């Protein structure tokens, strides 16, 4: 009897040990792909470098502005929350804008300084991601933007050009959060007042954007994806309160999840060069995320 008890205990211990070892191995670095266990380094080759299969901050593009470059320094810190089916992401975003030549040009530096996320098992498998949560500190890409005022006219319209570069400084490519590859885009933004009262303190403005967006991929044949960048919307001001709404996105040529678009809404209140900013973004097509953010901007 004692012999059978000993054999049973040893058997159960072996089963339990094997079960937890398999779970630990799967969580650490391996997932079954179509019934075949693959190391995370091999699964990185299966990543799809498009907005549909990456995190919410992997493919940034221009905010639709009113076509005028500001003449004040701006330092912004913004907390953001993004939610899609099977993915919840929170991050801290920072931005510094420096005007040049009294608003005739400008330079902006920005990026996500910290990000955390939680993906479902289904989303992890769909994206071929290694982990569902960040195993280490996750940081985003550094973005450098330059602006040039081409036309500034209260009577006709304002026209602004921008050149933008996203570096490969972000990490967690293995989790499909950032691409670890550079991208760049150029755009022209135009704006015109529909009406303007009280020296511009009450105004409604129509604005639009058109440009070119390009990013590097892991495709062995077509190493980059090119896209048409677009946007249209309205902005307004009522003394210390400003608001904006637009529909923007870009459209790539590969049709592999590269057609993201977003409805963006912004409400801001300014008091003595301090701005409180509330934003909401509703993703459509290949942008699967809805986003909400609260930001503070200090002007100098």
Question: Where do the model's predicted regions map?
Answer:
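C-terminal segment of classical bacterial N-terminal signal peptides
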Residues: 14-22
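Residue-level detection of beta-strand scaffold positions
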Residues: 147, 155-157, 202-209, 229, ...
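Bacterial N-terminal signal peptides that target proteins for export
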Residues: 1-9
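Outer membrane beta-barrel transmembrane domains
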Residues: 120-122, 127-132, 221-224, 228-300
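Transmembrane beta-strands of outer-membrane beta-barrel pores
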Residues: 79-83, 111-117, 150, 163-171, ...
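Detector for outer-membrane/organellar transmembrane beta-barrel domains
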Residues: 179-252
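Outer-membrane beta-barrel domain signature
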Residues: 50, 64, 81-87, 131-135, ...
């Amino acid at each position: 009897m004692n012999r059978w008890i000993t054999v049973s205990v040893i058997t159960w211990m072996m089963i339990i040990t094997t079960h937890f070892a398999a779970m630990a191995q799967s969580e650490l670095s391996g997932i079954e792909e179509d019934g075949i266990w693959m190391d995370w380094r091999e699964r990185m080759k299966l990543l799809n470098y498009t907005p549909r299969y990456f995190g919410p901050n992997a493919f940034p593009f221009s905010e639709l502005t009113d076509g005028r470059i500001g003449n004040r320094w701006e330092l912004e810190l913004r907390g953001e929350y993004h939610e899609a089916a099977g993915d919840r992401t929170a991050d801290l975003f920072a931005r510094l804008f420096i005007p040049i030549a009294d608003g005739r040009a400008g330079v902006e530096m920005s990026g996500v300084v910290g990000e955390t996320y939680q993906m479902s098992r289904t989303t992890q498998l769909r994206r071929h991601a290694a982990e569902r949560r960040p195993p280490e500190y996750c940081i985003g890409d550094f973005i450098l933007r330059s602006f040039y005022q081409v036309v500034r006219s209260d009577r006709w319209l304002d026209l602004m050009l921008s050149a933008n570069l996203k570096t490969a400084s972000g990490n967690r490519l293995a989790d499909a959060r950032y691409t670890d590859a550079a991208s760049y885009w150029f755009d022209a933004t135009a704006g015109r007042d529909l009406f303007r009262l009280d020296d511009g303190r009450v105004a409604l403005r129509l604005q639009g954007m058109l440009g070119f967006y390009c990013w590097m991929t892991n495709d062995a044949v077509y190493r980059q994806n090119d896209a048409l960048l677009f946007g249209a919307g309205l902005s307004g001001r009522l003394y210390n309160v400003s608001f904006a709404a637009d529909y923007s996105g870009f459209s790539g040529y590969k049709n592999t999840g590269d057609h993201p678009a977003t409805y963006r809404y912004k409400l801001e209140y300014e008091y003595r060069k301090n701005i409180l900013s509330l934003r909401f973004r509703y993703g459509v097509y290949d942008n699967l995320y809805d986003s909400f953010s609260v930001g503070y901007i200090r002007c100098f």
